[in-house]
Amino acid sequence: MTDKRKDTGSGKLLYCSFCGKSQHEVRKLIAGPSVYICDECVDLCNDIIREEIKEVMPKRDGNDLPTPQEIRTNLDDYVIGQNHAKKVLAVAVYNHYKRLRNGDTTSDGVELGKSNILLIGPTGSGKTLLAETLARMLDVPFTMADATTLTEAGYVGEDVENIIQKLLQKCDYDVAKAERGIVYIDEIDKISRKSDNPSITRDVSGEGVQQALLKLIEGTVASVPPQGGRKHPQQEFLQVDTSKILFICGGAFAGLDKVVEQRVATGTGIGFSADVRSKSEERTISDLFKKVEPEDLVKYGLIPEFIGRLPVTATLTELDQEALVKILREPKNALTKQYAALLELENVELEFRDDALVAIAHKAMARKTGARGLRSIVEAVLLDTMYELPSAVGVSKVVIDESVINGESEPLLIYENTENQAAGAE
């Protein structure tokens, strides 16, 4: 390496010893013993080192696979309640990755089947959050798909193969990583066929999509264009083995409780032996979901072959007010903690009183949106405060109580100088 220098009227002009650019062509030139390096070359060196570290990094040891109890404990940190669903998911996920670690066949020649998962639960009960948390914990690629946007190949809409393409995008088209990933397909109940009798008319977004998903979920080698490019037919397609990908399908299945109730009621007998229940003894939706059988899903509109590809079923219960209050306060990424962290960046403390949390939960219950509606309620309550706070001087604390949630008063602003204490804009 030689140090290129050139004398000028104002002194020596310095050059990067690696790329040859002058000090005027770069933002920073770092000096060493008889050599110089510019900021651009430093960035390039860092990129090279990062790539080499990736290549020599030891692959995840199979023994690092967390046990079902460890998976459940991790889910508890982020998802409130749904204990049965967590246990079912923990066992299914553990068995899936154990199968990948040891191969599809045991030493005795027993073939291990693939156990995809069906989540049944009301809107906002935590189906998506459970799937996301699992993927984050296991450090595997994760993608979501909306079943309502999927259509059969050849029709306007999103092809089923696009799901795998999205998964590849999440891991920079690394096929090996994608094959260890998790795919969550939401609103799966929306692709039920319109009746339980096969129709001669084309059901583009119903039974047809179920048929298209069959092979993908069960396991096939999907051909996906690199970078999603169909514009260049000469490019070689990437081959992805979907038998190694864990598929989790979720849906609210509105009306399924009626199907289950009808079956249960039919099986209880008639006349003197009938199981007569009073209004107070009527089963809740959550109770009925726990009794779901494959035949109920068939009657709902899922084809038997599709149900067979989702052998593990986990039902989630409707969240009550107490659970919603816990969701606001307890998880690692609880909403109150998130907004407190946002205001902390302005050096302002945020306090939610207990009665405020109950009021937020009550509003969410009235909207029938479960935990999903909590953020919009909190966002609306704090909108004006977050708008004005960056321009305000001397505010040290914001207090939210029940009256603020109900729109009866403004958030209480506490100033460093208590004499300037004010409520809202007053």
Curated annotation (Swiss-Prot):
GO molecular function terms attached to this record: ATP binding; ATP hydrolysis activity; ATP-dependent protein folding chaperone; protein dimerization activity; unfolded protein binding; zinc ion binding
HAMAP family associated with the record: ClpX
Quaternary structure note: Component of the ClpX-ClpP complex. Forms a hexameric ring that, in the presence of ATP, binds to fourteen ClpP subunits assembled into a disk-like structure with a central cavity, resembling the structure of eukaryotic proteasomes.
Gene: clpX
Entries under CDD domains matching the protein: RecA-like_ClpX
Entry-linked Gene3D superfamilies: 1.10.8.60, ClpX chaperone, C4-type zinc finger domain, P-loop containing nucleotide triphosphate hydrolases
CC terms in the record's Gene Ontology section: HslUV protease complex
Protein family: Belongs to the ClpX chaperone family.
Binding residue positions for ATP: P122, T123, G124, S125, G126, K127, T128, L129
Pfam families (UniProt xref): AAA_2, ClpB_D2-small, zf-C4_ClpX
Reported function: ATP-dependent specificity component of the Clp protease. It directs the protease to specific substrates. Can perform chaperone functions in the absence of ClpP.
Domain ClpX-type ZB: 4-57
InterPro entries, per database record: AAA+_ATPase (IPR003593), ATP-dep_Clp_protease_ClpX (IPR050052), ATPase_AAA_core (IPR003959), Clp_ATPase_C (IPR019489), Clp_protease_ATP-bd_su_ClpX (IPR004487), ClpX_bact (IPR046425), P-loop_NTPase (IPR027417), Znf_CppX_C4 (IPR010603)
PANTHER family: ATP-DEPENDENT CLP PROTEASE ATP-BINDING SUBUNIT CLPX-LIKE, MITOCHONDRIAL, ATP-DEPENDENT CLP PROTEASE ATP-BINDING SUBUNIT CLPX-LIKE, MITOCHONDRIAL-RELATED
Name of the protein: ATP-dependent Clp protease ATP-binding subunit ClpX
An annotated GO BP: cell division
Keywords: ATP-binding, Chaperone, Metal-binding, Nucleotide-binding, Zinc
SUPFAM superfamilies reported for this sequence: Glucocorticoid receptor-like (DNA-binding domain), P-loop containing nucleoside triphosphate hydrolases
Residues that hold Zn(2+) according to the record: C16, C19, C38, C41
Top-level taxon in the UniProt lineage: Bacteria
Database matches in PROSITE patterns: CLPX_ZB (PS51902)
